[in-house]
Regions:
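Conserved AdoMet/S-adenosylmethionine-binding subsite of the radical SAM
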Residues: 1-10, 19-159
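Charged phosphate-binding loop/patch that engages nucleotide di/tri-phosphates or the phosphate backbone
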Residues: 153-173
């Protein structure tokens, strides 16, 4: 990473495997910070203890949390038994951290409706930044998702327009 210093100003830590490892993540992040890089952490919000730890240690400069579905259908959408309290706790930790952040939802039409997106926004409440991301079926680990799609561009834009002002910034990606 020292060689890349002329080209890089930050590193993104992403992927559940790295983030969920209590031993590896903070140590790796400390080394990255010692090299003078900023760190963006991508999280699914399932490990609020780790999240608080890296925030408290000053190891993260930006946090992006995937908020995948309304809480009442979260486990169905992610196809796993997620502790919903952890999702809410992570969200609140991020909002109260003083660190720049965003929440984001990737729209898979077969899993989420426009009403679901409105529920997600209400569950998050006000905040810094909310991103609605188009689902790309060509980049998926689960082959079942190759048959899935995202909403039309008009519907995606409407999802942003319906709650202008709730978040300081709403983005369509």
């Amino acid at each position: 990473m020292n060689v890349g210093k002329a080209f890089l100003d930050g590193i993104v830590i992403t992927g559940g495997g790295t983030y969920n490892s209590i031993q590896i993540c903070p140590e790796l992040m400390k080394k990255i910070k010692e090299l003078g890089y900023k760190i963006k952490l991508d999280t699914n919000g399932t490990n609020p203890t780790m999240l608080r730890r890296v925030i408290d240690q000053g190891l993260v400069d930006y946090i992006a949390m995937d908020y995948k579905a309304p809480l009442n259908k979260y486990n169905e959408v992610v196809r796993a038994d997620v502790n919903l309290h952890d999702i809410v706790e992570s969200m609140e930790t991020i909002k109260n951290s003083g660190i720049e952040y965003e929440f984001r939802t990737t729209i898979v039409e077969q899993l989420l409706s426009p009403v679901d997106v409105e529920i997600i926004k209400a569950e998050i409440g006000s905040g810094e930044k909310y991103c609605i991301q188009k689902f790309n079926p060509t980049k998926t680990l689960d082959k079942d998702f190759l048959k899935c799609s995202t909403f039309s561009p008009q519907i995606m834009q409407n999802l942003i327009n319906t709650t202008k002002g709730v978040f300081k910034e709403e983005i369509l990606r």
